[in-house]
Amino acid sequence: MSNFSPREIVSELDRFIIGQKDAKRAVAIALRNRWRRQQLEGQMREEVMPKNILMIGPTGVGKTEISRRLAKLAGAPFVKVEATKFTEVGYVGRDVEQIIRDLVEIAITLVREKRREDVKAKAHLNAEERVLDALVGKTASPATRDSFRKKLRNGEMDDKEIEIEVSDSGASPNFEIPGMPGANIGVLNISDMLGKAMGGRTKTRKTTVKDSYPILINDESDKLLDQDQIVQEALRVSEDEGIVFIDEIDKIAAREGGSGAGVSREGVQRDLLPLVEGTTVATKYGPVKTDHILFITSGAFHVSKPSDLLPELQGRLPIRVELSALTREDFRRILTETEASLIKQYIALMETEEVKLEFSDDAIDALADIAVDLNATVENIGARRLQTVMEKVLDEISFTAPDKAGATFIIDAAYVKEKIGGLAKNTDLSRFIL
């Protein structure tokens, strides 16, 4: 587990997300508290629970991005779900325990990737031997193998086609089993059991020497890994480091005087309660305790209010953070200051066609102005509006770029207004196009 200080976490998030200092501080403290808990011993370590977070703010201001970047920074298993996708237990639809099962699957992938890195050197040597077997046969003399090995390492054999045998991990079909706690168990993994009994199924693949290496390295890595250890480690990582982001929690808040779907909405909240408070969820890999999983919830709360959530659920989300709507200056900074800003992305994309894009300062001002105006007059979708505006401005250049290799386009305020000014003024049209 990474031991970044809260200040380091915030400065890392600043590289990708503009503004929203309060939200960044809240998640930074939550992540640091996890590290602090890991340093504790015995009973006290069990007693310290994570302080779950409720983010309140309009769409497109960075709620999801903050959580996603945080999980990446921590190297923790992260799952994002929308509260509206779930139904009360007993109704048709996904139940909330599926969130934890998805988290475990993601943790297994993470742990396996880390373990593969540890054995990569050994796996690479084994893969090389298998490529040699395919090229010269298993019975070839050591001298022949050595001469071919030299050619292999010099890249002389890269384009030669070979046939390789790789283990067939053909996905066994998964079935939802009604009333079973570990649903999605699959056909009780009969194919897995048979595979182990018969030494594993293999299939033959035809590929070039160069392309065979990644496949064989993965195959050899998996042979060197202990799957049971990976599962145990993944279960531990899910319990101690997992982060669950539940979006649109405001949509399941019962509005005052509401009726109809309110029953199911409240039911989803009641099902979330034990998950957020701490319960044990059955998965096909084993039970997972949710006591120390960090839950970050978010919602715009345009129609409902946080106080419309069940009081018990409100109590389990002790940290409230309000994210502010984006200003014109924020839009300017999003276009220019973030690590992979939209402008940098478009410049890089056009470079692949040998077309050079240059944006003047007044063009950036014009883009920010149009995005702010559209958010105010049409619908406030936050930073996502910039993508729509940029696509419209660069539509012509993107379309004709393959025929304009070597050209340089200078995007200034006049160009932006020419491409988009009329549409932005015509509110009726911009409702549909921007």
From Swiss-Prot:
Q: Does the keyword Chaperone apply?
A: yes
Q: Which Pfam families match?
A: AAA, AAA_2
Q: Which GO terms describe its molecular function?
A: ATP binding; ATP hydrolysis activity; peptidase activity; proteasome-activating activity
Q: Which domain of life is it from?
A: Bacteria
Q: Which CDD domains match?
A: RecA-like_HslU
Q: What are the subcellular locations of this protein?
A: Cytoplasm
List, in alphabetical order, the GO biological process terms annotated in this UniProt record: protein unfolding; proteolysis involved in protein catabolic process
Residues annotated as binding ATP are: 18, 60-65, 247, 312, 384
Keyword annotations of the record? ATP-binding, Chaperone, Cytoplasm, Nucleotide-binding, Stress response
Which cysteine pairs are joined by S-S bonds?
A: none
GO cellular component assignments: HslUV protease complex
The subunit field of the Swiss-Prot or TrEMBL record says: A double ring-shaped homohexamer of HslV is capped on each side by a ring-shaped HslU homohexamer. The assembly of the HslU/HslV complex is dependent on binding of ATP.
Q: Which family does the record assign?
A: Belongs to the ClpX chaperone family. HslU subfamily.
The record describes the protein's role as: ATPase subunit of a proteasome-like degradation complex; this subunit has chaperone activity. The binding of ATP and its subsequent hydrolysis by HslU are essential for unfolding of protein substrates subsequently hydrolyzed by HslV. HslU recognizes the N-terminal part of its protein substrates and unfolds these before they are guided to HslV for hydrolysis.
Name of the molecule in the record: ATP-dependent protease ATPase subunit HslU
Gene that encodes it: hslU
